């Protein structure tokens, strides 16, 4: 009965207790026995457990007997809370009619809480506020209720007070889900339409598609048609996660479950696509999701050049489960063969790098992250540049446009001054500032390349960890940008090039040259480290040579003898400098990030 189905997500900022609440709900509904129950059941990746974050959306179909005696099917769809994975949140919400908005009763409303809640409201989802961690001594429910009403603008007087850790208030949450979240709309007799909300690769059965059936009924043995690429597949198995996979005889309108149909390639089962039947196809596909574009790019190079093929294989395997990871081969004079990879943000980059090192045993050199720039040439052609070393000659460029984001920062009022100073220093333009109780909401326009560098770390340090940030892409905007090159012994190192704003280019060049001088190990000859904009050198530092005391064996004696030995040493150093190769350590490539973070 479609009337007795409830589809809901849990949305929250990181660390507000979302995964713990999901664990308690699963336990309460008997989804897993106490023996099988472990912390963060839905976070299946080791990395998710260690960092205490959710990266991929997971689901659980649970049966709950309400106090009115009716048995309900509750489909819980877990969502990530980090800004990098906000597109996963919008995907999960599109399969739901309701969402639990979990807010930490001691921390209060934070930036991602606001962003995810607005996403839910835009998608027409019923939002139920829940105050978690009510058992903490620092919990202040009245203040947090006022914040929810002021900042988000939804009624929160009736918000439930719970503690996911102790299990207090869980039955009230389930009753509220049944009472307030509407049942799914959909017709079982209509042609099949199912929305793919996630897909991943399983080494035994191929691609597993997680779908929300909107209309119709789906049974094993039926021939499926994917509406975007018109590909046909035979449906082999359908089922639900409870949270372990359980096969079913059918999935009908309103339900969330999985389809296995022997697809070998994840590109064929695109998230946001509509699945229908070959014999009785639907006339219109469902509204999908916008294609997610990478925001941050970095070069990944193997330390050993013979590991290149292994790195390609590892990236391809990772892409099977992470469709938002983009990569293409690239060559660097300094680092050899590697890949230019596109990520959703810095956390995504960090996680991909860690998974490559852990799961695939790779030793990597990662170049400093950059963003995409639009370059308009004199002939009117627009090219997108994600690698600074590929920037065309300045003489052929009409203008360079950089990506600008709208950042929403929530910060306690005592740190507002420091945060405003930080944003202004990063070329930010204030758009809005709103006081809400003890919190202040600042809205800034910021260039994305300033945010990518070290903005997040600095924001946390100037606010003692209390500020939270959420951002979305706004537009490409013309800016006065130049390419800063680093030369080591008069050789340009392409992997160290970066694009900076002209106003701060000289200072950046000086700081970078000084940093390089500290990091490059001393050799037997002098090394010149220069920062250049075009042909113009803006900074120079020398790494002094190590030298042997060739006069140690001369006790007294003639000055000409000493001079002869020194001249001989000097000639040897000169020859060495001409043929000598300078090893650049990995730390030097990351120095670009820490340049102004002294």
From Swiss-Prot:
Residues the entry annotates as binding GTP: 15-20, 132-135
CDD domains: EF4_II, EF4_III, LepA, lepA_C
A GO-annotated cellular component: plasma membrane
Catalytic activity of the protein: GTP + H2O = GDP + phosphate + H(+)
InterPro entries xrefs: EF-4, EFG_III/V, EFG_V-like, EFTu-like_2, G_TR_CS, LepA_C_sf, LepA_CTD, LepA_IV
Main location: membrane
Gene Ontology terms: biological process: positive regulation of translation
Domain of life: Bacteria
Domain tr-type G residues, every copy: 3-185
DNA-binding keyword on record: no
Entry keywords, A to Z: Cell inner membrane, Cell membrane, GTP-binding, Hydrolase, Membrane, Nucleotide-binding, Protein biosynthesis
EC number: 3.6.5.n1
Pfam families: EFG_C, GTP_EFTU, GTP_EFTU_D2, LepA_C
Subcellular location: Cell inner membrane
Gene3D superfamilies: 3.30.70.240, Elongation factor 4, C-terminal domain, Elongation Factor G (Translational Gtpase), domain 3, P-loop containing nucleotide triphosphate hydrolases, Translation factors
Molecular functions (GO terms): GTP binding; GTPase activity; guanosine tetraphosphate binding; ribosome binding; translation elongation factor activity
Membrane topology recorded in Swiss-Prot or TrEMBL: Peripheral membrane protein
Task of the protein: Required for accurate and efficient protein synthesis under certain stress conditions. May act as a fidelity factor of the translation reaction, by catalyzing a one-codon backward translocation of tRNAs on improperly translocated ribosomes. Back-translocation proceeds from a post-translocation (POST) complex to a pre-translocation (PRE) complex, thus giving elongation factor G a second chance to translocate the tRNAs correctly. Binds to ribosomes in a GTP-dependent manner.
Protein family per UniProt: Belongs to the TRAFAC class translation factor GTPase superfamily. Classic translation factor GTPase family. LepA subfamily.
Record protein name field: Elongation factor 4
Gene transcribed to yield this protein: lepA
